[in-house]
């Protein structure tokens, strides 16, 4: 029954860290966090069998690191209706929480794939998609772009071509009408039994509509979208893990307005071309500005690298380094 809610193995855990923790708590049973509220957690040991449980006392203390508490998608060990341990995460998506203070916010854990849902209206923004990709890939999760509202776009192929030009060919891009049955077929390769997928994107991008289509029922509330900026209200108010008919698990999330880096990200996946060129520079500490023998500048000179792409690489790298510096200062 655990496999139906995303247990990653056909039997007992194959991961050494999981084995060790399960051995310590041998009288406890595993469960998955399917909802997280201020008042506590809802977990499941099987599909459609939610259980309200008490969290660890330490998690309720003021000042306890938020990223060390359980989040939707996490696996925990239960003693009765009480969480006694958090199993190690295989993957996680996190960002810097909104506000002036440095605080990490975990979005979801133990994912295989994250669908970046983007409407082909005023919501379409390749640079924002790029930020999502950095956050997702840095957490060990596979990003997939899902373009919705194809009926509002005159040339869907052109939008897909923009992303193909901007991103690595390895990034999957799928365009669908979220109201129809086609997403079930188009997205099936990522929705196989035992896999876990999260929906990320702005409010009004079509996440709730897509969720209802994949579920095969109208379970999630769908809101109206403002015409002036293609933004919607938060119809999804909390994260929830939902078993799909395909055998996969889907985590629906509220829309995110800010995508701040924590300082732990890297750009190896999303800027693999620049990272590879950098290894060919004459100097190991080349800043790709005016240094002789710079392979990155040479690529711009011969037209194989878009200078705007390098500019954005510098911008994102600067944000990541800045976030890392602020995190370090906060520790001392």
UniProtKB/Swiss-Prot annotation:
UniProt xrefs under SUPFAM superfamilies: P-loop containing nucleoside triphosphate hydrolases
Gene Ontology cellular component terms for the protein in this record: cytoplasm
EC number in record: 3.6.1.-
The record's free-text note on cofactor binding: Binds 1 zinc ion per subunit.
Subcellular location: Cytoplasm
Positions bound to Zn(2+): 281, 286, 288, 294
Domain CP-type G stretches: 103-259
A GO molecular-function annotation: rRNA binding
Similarity remark: Belongs to the TRAFAC class YlqF/YawG GTPase family. RsgA subfamily.
Subunit structure comment from the entry: Monomer. Associates with 30S ribosomal subunit, binds 16S rRNA.
Physiological role: One of several proteins that assist in the late maturation steps of the functional core of the 30S ribosomal subunit. Helps release RbfA from mature subunits. May play a role in the assembly of ribosomal proteins into the subunit. Circularly permuted GTPase that catalyzes slow GTP hydrolysis, GTPase activity is stimulated by the 30S ribosomal subunit.
Pfam family for this entry, one: RsgA_GTPase
Natural source organism: Xylella fastidiosa (strain M12)
Name under which the protein is recorded: Small ribosomal subunit biogenesis GTPase RsgA
Binding locations of GTP: 148-151, 201-209
Any one of the GO BP annotations: ribosomal small subunit biogenesis
Enzyme class: hydrolase
Keyword Metal-binding belongs to the record: yes
Source domain of life: Bacteria
Keyword terms: Cytoplasm, GTP-binding, Hydrolase, Metal-binding, Nucleotide-binding, Ribosome biogenesis, RNA-binding, rRNA-binding, Zinc
Tagged with keyword Methyltransferase: no
């Amino acid at each position: 029954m655990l496999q139906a809610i995303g247990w990653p193995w056909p039997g007992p855990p194959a991961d050494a860290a999981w084995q060790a923790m399960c051995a310590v708590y041998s009288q406890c049973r595993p469960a998955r966090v399917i909802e997280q509220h201020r008042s506590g957690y809802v977990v499941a040991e099987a599909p459609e069998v939610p259980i309200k449980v008490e969290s660890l006392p330490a998690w309720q203390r003021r000042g306890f690191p938020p990223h060390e508490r359980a989040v939707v998608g996490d696996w925990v060990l239960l003693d009765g209706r009480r969480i006694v341990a958090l199993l190690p995460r295989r993957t996680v998506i996190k960002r810097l929480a909104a506000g002036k203070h440095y605080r990490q916010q975990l979005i979801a854990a133990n994912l295989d794939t994250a669908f970046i849902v983007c409407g082909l209206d005023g919501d379409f923004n390749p640079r924002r998609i790029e930020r999502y990709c950095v956050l997702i890939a840095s957490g060990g999760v596979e990003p997939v772009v899902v373009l919705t509202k194809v009926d509002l776009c005159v040339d869907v192929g052109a939008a897909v071509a923009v992303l193909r030009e901007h991103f690595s060919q390895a990034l999957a891009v799928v365009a669908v009408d979220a109201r129809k049955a086609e997403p079930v077929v188009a997205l099936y390769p990522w929705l196989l039994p035992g896999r876990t997928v999260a929906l990320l994107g702005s409010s009004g991008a079509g996440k709730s509509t897509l969720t209802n289509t994949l579920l095969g029922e109208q379970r999630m509330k769908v809101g109206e979208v403002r015409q002036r900026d293609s933004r919607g209200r938060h119809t999804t108010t909390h994260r929830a893990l939902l078993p799909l008919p395909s055998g996969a698990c889907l985590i629906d999330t509220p829309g995110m307005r800010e995508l701040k880096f924590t300082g732990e990200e890297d750009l190896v996946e999303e800027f693999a071309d620049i990272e590879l060129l950098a290894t060919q520079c004459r100097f190991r500490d080349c800043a790709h500005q005016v240094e002789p023998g710079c392979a990155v500048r040479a690529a711009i000179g011969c037209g194989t690298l878009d200078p705007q792409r390098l500019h954005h690489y510098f911008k994102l790298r600067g944000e990541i380094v800045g976030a890392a510096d602020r995190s370090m200062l906060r520790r001392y």
